[in-house]
Amino acid sequence: MCTVCGCGGHSVEDQFKAHLKSQGKDGAHKPAPFAVLAEPQGPHSHSHSHWHTHADGTSHAHPHAHSHSHAAGHGAEADSDHPHAHGHDHGHSHGACAHDIHLGHGPAGTEVPGMSQARLIEIETDILSKNNQYAARNRAALAKNCTFATNLVSSPGSGKTTLLVKTIEMLGAQPLAVIEGDQQTTNDADRIRATGAPAIQVNTGKGCHLDGAMVEQALAHLPLPAGALLFIENVGNLVCPAAFDLGEDAKVAILSVTEGEDKPLKYPDMFAAAGLAILNKVDLAPYCDVDLDLYEANIRRVNPQIEVLRVSARTGDGMGAWIDWLRAGLARKAR
């Protein structure tokens, strides 16, 4: 997560209020303004672990924390104004910069000017503890309803929404609902609603991820029959969402074959937190000069226990295994 992520107040679109407002007295449809429930939030912080991979291939994790305010956006980038020590030798070349900058070696996993590592860890503990309270309430409510919830996380453009649309089509009469997270617009929620499935859009504004409180608010306005599947499509971001429990049963990390085989090593936190990785757009592999086996190997370097599925949401290849995984998860919740 960035040192100053600029998370702002979020809004949850209530599709039913929006629908009612879209109709005039004569019953004719008119363009509907967004009906939103706004919840401005005060100062807070985020945290999670960061992985660091050395040139010799060894990897290890660091905790990470930072604080910021929800009251306003931030326009400045974080920078470091102090020297940084390294415990290993560097070669020197006069033709190029010989020293990389690593800000994650301290106990807190990051550096913020004017703030000690101890204070960063204190903030980390506080914000995650509060989020976990919301997540626990969500988890209890979903368990009571025998709902299997997945938190879909990825970079922007990995194909999450296309995968969801295909999934909904293949599930047929299976009860389900979707929470869509984006900074702005209802584009993805509109695509989901076009399939006939209920969906709520959560616009996070300056926020770079969903959190437990946002999901709790969305659930209050989403019809969710007993025994349903719940899909939470998080904001496109491979860093920040890794730290935040939403009350889901599993995080599902989605990776497009166009993103590069080393993506799991460069952004390991999410793959370490996920129970399933979906390697999407495999139909493009022959045109991208990529090694699918290397993708899987790098994912498992970060998380040896993770399950990996190769899927093309466009052609349907591999989708059967994904549907089976969802139904197995739902069956476990019903026991």
Swiss-Prot record:
<feature type="binding site">
    <location>
        <position position="2"/>
    </location>
    <ligand>
        <name>Ni(2+) 1</name>
    </ligand>
</feature>
<dbReference type="GO" id="GO:0005525">
    <property type="term" value="F:GTP binding"/>
</dbReference>
<keyword id="KW-0533">Nickel</keyword>
<keyword id="KW-0862">Zinc</keyword>
<feature type="region of interest" description="Disordered">
    <location>
        <begin position="36"/>
        <end position="112"/>
    </location>
</feature>
<feature type="compositionally biased region" description="Basic residues">
    <location>
        <begin position="61"/>
        <end position="71"/>
    </location>
</feature>
<keyword id="KW-0547">Nucleotide-binding</keyword>
<feature type="binding site">
    <location>
        <position position="209"/>
    </location>
    <ligand>
        <name>Zn(2+)</name>
    </ligand>
</feature>
<comment type="function">
    <text>Involved in the maturation of [NiFe] hydrogenases. Required for nickel insertion into the metal center of the hydrogenase. Exhibits a low intrinsic GTPase activity, which is essential for nickel insertion.</text>
</comment>
<keyword id="KW-0378">Hydrolase</keyword>
<dbReference type="InterPro" id="IPR027417">
    <property type="entry name" value="P-loop_NTPase"/>
</dbReference>
<feature type="binding site">
    <location>
        <position position="240"/>
    </location>
    <ligand>
        <name>Ni(2+) 2</name>
    </ligand>
</feature>
<feature type="compositionally biased region" description="Basic and acidic residues">
    <location>
        <begin position="76"/>
        <end position="103"/>
    </location>
</feature>
<comment type="similarity">
    <text>Belongs to the SIMIBI class G3E GTPase family. HypB/HupM subfamily.</text>
</comment>
<feature type="binding site">
    <location>
        <position position="240"/>
    </location>
    <ligand>
        <name>Zn(2+)</name>
    </ligand>
</feature>
<dbReference type="GO" id="GO:0008270">
    <property type="term" value="F:zinc ion binding"/>
</dbReference>
<protein>
    <recommendedName>
        <fullName>Hydrogenase maturation factor HypB</fullName>
    </recommendedName>
</protein>
<dbReference type="InterPro" id="IPR004392">
    <property type="entry name" value="Hyd_mat_HypB"/>
</dbReference>
<feature type="binding site">
    <location>
        <position position="209"/>
    </location>
    <ligand>
        <name>Ni(2+) 2</name>
    </ligand>
</feature>
<dbReference type="GO" id="GO:0051604">
    <property type="term" value="P:protein maturation"/>
</dbReference>
<dbReference type="GO" id="GO:0003924">
    <property type="term" value="F:GTPase activity"/>
</dbReference>
<keyword id="KW-0342">GTP-binding</keyword>
<feature type="binding site">
    <location>
        <position position="208"/>
    </location>
    <ligand>
        <name>Zn(2+)</name>
    </ligand>
</feature>
<feature type="binding site">
    <location>
        <position position="7"/>
    </location>
    <ligand>
        <name>Ni(2+) 1</name>
    </ligand>
</feature>
<feature type="binding site">
    <location>
        <position position="5"/>
    </location>
    <ligand>
        <name>Ni(2+) 1</name>
    </ligand>
</feature>
<dbReference type="InterPro" id="IPR003495">
    <property type="entry name" value="CobW/HypB/UreG_nucleotide-bd"/>
</dbReference>
<feature type="region of interest" description="G-domain">
    <location>
        <begin position="149"/>
        <end position="309"/>
    </location>
</feature>
<dbReference type="GO" id="GO:0016151">
    <property type="term" value="F:nickel cation binding"/>
</dbReference>
<keyword id="KW-0479">Metal-binding</keyword>
<feature type="binding site">
    <location>
        <position position="208"/>
    </location>
    <ligand>
        <name>Ni(2+) 2</name>
    </ligand>
</feature>
<dbReference type="Pfam" id="PF02492">
    <property type="entry name" value="cobW"/>
</dbReference>
